[in-house]
A protein has these predicted regions:
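Active-site loop immediately N-terminal to the catalytic Tyr-X3-Lys motif
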Residues: 89, 136-142, 164-165, 200, ...
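Residue(s) in the substrate-gating loop at a strand-loop-helix junction
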Residues: 131
Length: 239
């Protein structure tokens, strides 16, 4: 059955891979972007909407546009996120708050808007994209790790709150994934991360996307409140 899917932060990386996976499955897919929409073949069959998830008004407007074009959102992939890495002693309140406002509060805003129509339909899927560092922590990423850890508490609270309406809420926690965000890593840092991953490599956006697509499917109807790692075993910690 074709569903209406909205992927926030869907212009590149994991978000775009999720959007393309849903399009490939025959779904009607919208993506939000903050700076530039996907282009060329990446944008094929996607409805693209500008949206800053830190602005509740823009979130409402994006959902209104998607609903007018495709219909009510049935699957939400809350992926929009940013980083602002630095050591805590150099991190001011704004650097902490901006990341949390985007990654955590942005997820709250989009999920709150999505469940309004999902409740009426008595069906819905919400998948938050977190990170392995939400569980393990990472030096220089206190803001990012806190925001990603917060998504777990948010998702499990929503999972309990809306279970009676047949709305499932889950988290996917990627490890190191080959994206534009990781492309800037130095070769030494990249090697160190690879050596820490039991499977010995970075993952791909498509591997994350397939996990997300499964959680949105009828096959995952009895899964809610879960945190699914796609991290090559990194989250297990050192052996």
């Amino acid at each position: 059955m074709s569903r209406v899917v909205l992927v926030t932060g869907g212009a590149r990386g994991i978000g775009l891979a999720c959007a393309r996976a849903f399009v490939g499955a025959g779904d009607r897919v919208a993506v939000t972007y903050r700076s530039a929409p996907p282009s060329g073949t990446d944008a094929a069959d996607l409805f693209c909407v500008s949206c800053d998830v830190t602005d509740a008004g823009q979130v409402d407007a994006a959902f209104d546009a998607v609903e007018a074009e495709l219909g009510p959102v049935e699957v939400l992939v809350a992926n929009a996120g940013i980083t602002a890495d630095m050591l805590v002693l150099r991190m001011d309140d704004a650097a902490f708050a901006t990341v949390v406002d985007t990654n955590l509060a942005g997820g709250f805003r989009t999920a709150k808007r999505a469940v309004q129509k999902m409740m009426r339909a008595r069906w819905g899927r919400i998948i938050f994209i977190s990170s392995v560092v939400g569980a393990t922590g990472q030096a220089g990423q206190a803001n990012y790790a806190a925001s990603k850890a917060g998504l777990v508490g948010l998702s499990r609270s929503l999972a309990r709150e809306f279970a009676s309406r047949n709305i499932t809420v889950n988290v996917v926690a990627p490890g190191p994934i080959t994206t534009e965000m990781t492309a800037s890593l130095s070769e030494d840092r990249r090697t160190a991360i690879t050596e820490a991953v039991p499977l010995g490599r970075f993952g791909t956006p498509e591997e994350v996307a397939e996990t997300v697509r499964f959680l949105a499917s009828d096959a995952a109807a009895f899964i809610t409140g879960a945190v699914v790692p796609v991290d090559g075993g990194l989250g297990m910690g050192p052996s």
